[in-house]
């Protein structure tokens, strides 16, 4: 990153903890105090980035804190996830070595960072399933896919795990394995779930498994291994499963294209409902009940398209991108057009006052330049958090790391987290205080 864009924080902590060192006794779980911003994001672990156009201040995880000889990428969670606890104690991110000419990095894993103790904990977070960090109880849930066997033709196992970060951060508790009813012996499991999302009691995980040429949805009890199948089909790719954040009897899924084991591509088929001038409703967003019944959530009346959808915290609204940002109340059908210019991924604050989104203009390829933005809905004003994130690959050799910014609110809307990048081609976990964004868009 250009040194003119990096400003060292004035106050450094006197206490420096070796990232590989963990105390035997974790701190008191009842202690909830947080450090002032300059101490939380001290220069031992973070670099301060000031956007050269807007002046917005963000903090980037340093790429050299894990090794004295090797720099690493640090990536945030998906836009619909939380990767920081509400008490501001823990965050997690993915790490990897630098891509070379669009080739997948050779080392990939994940870390938890303890903001209070200034130390890291390693976990296996690279199995194609985004972990779940309970923001209120500071418990991390993650999944490990089984190894391929029979010359790569078989992958029929996997297991869930959890870490209690407040009380036993060095310990990993084993949870349920993928049942044979989902992945029979000798089958090939491409995916167990896209994101770990849990029922209200945090005992069951929603699966949107892809096994051989079948797509299976349902709930797996993490503690007993009991499997409750909701639906199974062999034609429609249901992915990005997300439990309703307020109830355990419905989930949001997305229909996407897929390629079967014979190499045939299956495109999205519009609903045969005569809507949108006879074209039929674009069925990207699907609401599913435990009996397997599905209902299409209609996109904008003026734009029959949707992508990158998610739940609002109330469990009654979903949001999505389609050029801009959109919201629909799934109970009443009421629709709202939130933002009209380009947005690729978005996330909305719990009070619905603020929106963060990213924009892949002008490159439109994975690993290209991006901008990350903030919208104050009360004033209608926007500001760039990152006016232009540098490209990390070229268009002819796109990134394999899914390096999109994926901005999202954390800590009860206090911060926005995303994945940024630097001029050396490294990805950087980035956190931005929201209060300055509100102030800058209130003038």
Identify the residue ranges that each predicted region occupies:
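Asp-box/WD-like beta-propeller blade repeats and closely related beta-sheet repeat scaffolds
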Residues: 123-213, 227-236
């Amino acid at each position: 990153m250009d040194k003119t864009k990096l400003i060292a924080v004035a106050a450094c902590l006197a206490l420096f903890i070796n990232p590989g060192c963990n105390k035997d006794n974790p701190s008191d779980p009842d202690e909830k105090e947080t450090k002032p911003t300059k101490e939380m994001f001290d220069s031992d672990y973070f670099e301060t980035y000031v956007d050269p156009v807007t002046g917005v201040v963000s903090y980037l995880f340093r790429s050299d804190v894990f090794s004295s000889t090797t720099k690493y990428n640090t990536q945030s969670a998906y836009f619909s996830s939380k990767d920081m606890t509400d008490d501001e104690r823990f965050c997690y991110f993915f790490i990897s070595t630098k891509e070379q000419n669009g080739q997948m990095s050779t080392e990939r894993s994940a870390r938890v960072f303890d903001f209070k103790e200034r130390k890291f904990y390693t976990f296996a977070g690279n199995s194609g399933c985004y972990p779940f960090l309970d923001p209120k109880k500071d418990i991390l849930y993650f999944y490990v896919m089984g190894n391929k066997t029979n010359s790569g033709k078989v992958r029929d196992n996997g297991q869930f795990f959890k870490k209690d970060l407040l009380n036993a951060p060095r310990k990993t508790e084993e949870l349920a394995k993928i049942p044979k009813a989902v992945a029979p012996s000798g089958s090939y499991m491409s995916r167990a779930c896209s994101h770990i999302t849990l029922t209200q009691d945090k005992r069951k995980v929603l699966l949107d498994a892809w096994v051989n040429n079948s797509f299976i949805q349902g709930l797996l009890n993490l503690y007993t291994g009991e499997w409750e199948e909701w639906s199974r089909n062999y034609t429609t790719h249901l992915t990005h499963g997300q439990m309703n954040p307020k109830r355990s009897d419905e989930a949001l899924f997305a229909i996407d294209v897929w390629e079967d084991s014979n190499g045939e591509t299956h495109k999205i088929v519009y609903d045969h409902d005569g809507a949108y001038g006879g074209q039929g409703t674009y069925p990207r967003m699907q609401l599913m009940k435990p009996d397997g019944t599905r209902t299409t959530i209609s996109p904008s009346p003026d734009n029959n398209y949707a992508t990158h959808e998610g739940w609002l915290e109330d469990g009654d609204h979903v949001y999505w991108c389609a050029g801009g940002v959109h919201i629909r109340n799934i109970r009443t059908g009421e629709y709202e057009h939130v933002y009209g210019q380009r947005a690729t991924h978005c996330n909305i604050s719990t009070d619905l006052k603020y929106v963060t989104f990213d924009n892949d203009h002008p490159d439109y390829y994975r690993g290209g330049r991006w901008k990350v933005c903030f919208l104050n809905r009360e004033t209608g004003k926007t500001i760039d958090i990152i006016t232009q994130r540098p490209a990390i690959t070229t268009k002819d050799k796109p990134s394999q790391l899914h390096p999109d910014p994926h901005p999202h609110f954390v800590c009860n809307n206090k911060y926005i987290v995303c994945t940024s990048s630097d001029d050396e081609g490294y990805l950087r976990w980035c956190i931005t205080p929201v209060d300055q964004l509100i102030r800058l868009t209130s003038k």
